[in-house]
């Protein structure tokens, strides 16, 4: 983290139209933009000098691209609060090492002058392995349009991998919660003759999971934080309406996992249906765990998967399973439904 001359070069090259970005000692050429949101842009980039990253001892060799292409996230930072949030994301991302969690390969935060006001601001560049098949959300939406769906065993294999990544986070001391588990934060890579590879990403909302709430003020602060960092259709009830005296823990992620399993099957959160109803309230649907199942004579998935979702979507956190319980259960289902 921090600033360097090479980091400043990233700014000047971009302004002059060179299309090259330096992240510390490695230079990357921007190939094309992959996406954007808020103050962040994601680009497909390619190493200008081959094998530059391969010489960094801190990077797992399995994360080095064969063709030198990577994903680069550029974040425009305008306030000190935003700067601290980016630093927090970098710190947290650097903690994790698991096949189903997206690794942060390198990063740089650089000072730049604002183009209009001339004030000193910052830009952050975060480098990751690239997964061009898109997110689980992208794929699920495309399949819904074509009236297609994953097979039961593929649903379970994808879900099992997300659980594996989350278990790694929950196993820290103290445990970390992701706080924004959803299909849009799961990258998918198709593999010939194997189930798709699923990788949980975006640790901008990840924090130590356990927090003691001792007052109404603290409860309201948590609700406000959750409204900004936890996607509403996948947000646990205790983050919508937090009691004044309660212990919050990693079971907020378990609720989101239940919503995600539903979404892998049906392409949407189990509660978003209310947004299409007159006077419908997403918060009330979540607080009451009002899951709406698709109707039809021939449901595409067995009742055991529906029961699995319901097990995770318990309004009271103490009634939800932990990640180890979930993994044991999904492994049993994989054995049951394997061809």
Sequence positions of predicted segments:
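Conserved short submotifs of the Hanks-type protein kinase catalytic core
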Residues: 118-135
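Juxta-kinase regulatory segment immediately upstream of eukaryotic protein kinase catalytic domains
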Residues: 1-23, 31
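Catalytic-loop of the protein kinase fold
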Residues: 170-190
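Activation segment/activation loop of eukaryotic-type protein kinase catalytic domains
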Residues: 184-230
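Short beta-strand micro-motifs within the conserved protein kinase catalytic domain, predominantly
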Residues: 103-122
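Protein kinase glycine-rich loop
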Residues: 31-38, 42
């Amino acid at each position: 983290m921090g600033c360097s001359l090479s980091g400043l070069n990233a700014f000047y090259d971009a302004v002059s139209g060179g299309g090259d970005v330096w992240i510390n000692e490695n230079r990357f050429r921007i190939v094309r933009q992959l996406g954007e949101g808020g103050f962040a842009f994601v680009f497909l980039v390619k190493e200008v000098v081959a094998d530059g990253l391969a010489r960094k001892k801190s990077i797992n060799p399995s994360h080095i691209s064969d063709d030198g292409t990577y994903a680069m996230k550029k974040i425009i930072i305008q306030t000190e609060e935003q700067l601290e949030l980016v630093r927090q994301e970098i710190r947290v991302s650097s903690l994790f090492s698991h096949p189903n969690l997206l690794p942060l390969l390198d990063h740089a935060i650089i000072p730049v002058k604002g183009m209009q006001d001339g004030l000193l601001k910052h830009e952050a560049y975060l480098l990751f392995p690239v997964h061009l098949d898109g997110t689980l959300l992208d794929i699920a939406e495309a399949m819904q349009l074509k009236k297609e769906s994953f097979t039961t065993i593929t649903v379970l294999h994808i879900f099992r991998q997300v659980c594996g990544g989350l278990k790694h986070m929950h196993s820290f001391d103290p445990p970390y919660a992701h706080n924004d588990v959803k299909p849009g934060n799961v990258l998918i890579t198709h593999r010939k003759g194997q189930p798709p590879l699923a990788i949980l990403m975006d640790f901008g909302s990840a924090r130590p999971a356990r927090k003691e709430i001792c007052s109404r003020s603290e409860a309201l602060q948590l609700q406000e934080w959750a409204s900004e960092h936890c996607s509403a259709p996948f947000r646990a009830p205790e983050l919508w309406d937090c009691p004044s005296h309660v212990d919050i823990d990693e079971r907020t992620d378990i609720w989101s996992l239940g919503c995600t399993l539903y979404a892998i099957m049906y392409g949407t959160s189990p509660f978003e249906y209310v947004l299409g109803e007159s006077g419908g309230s997403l918060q009330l649907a979540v607080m009451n765990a009002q899951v709406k199942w698709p109707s039809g004579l021939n449901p595409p998935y067995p009742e055991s998967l529906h029961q699995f979702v319901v097990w995770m979507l318990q309004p009271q956190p103490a009634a939800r399973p932990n990640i180890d319980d979930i993994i044991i259960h999904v492994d049993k289902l994989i054995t049951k439904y394997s061809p």
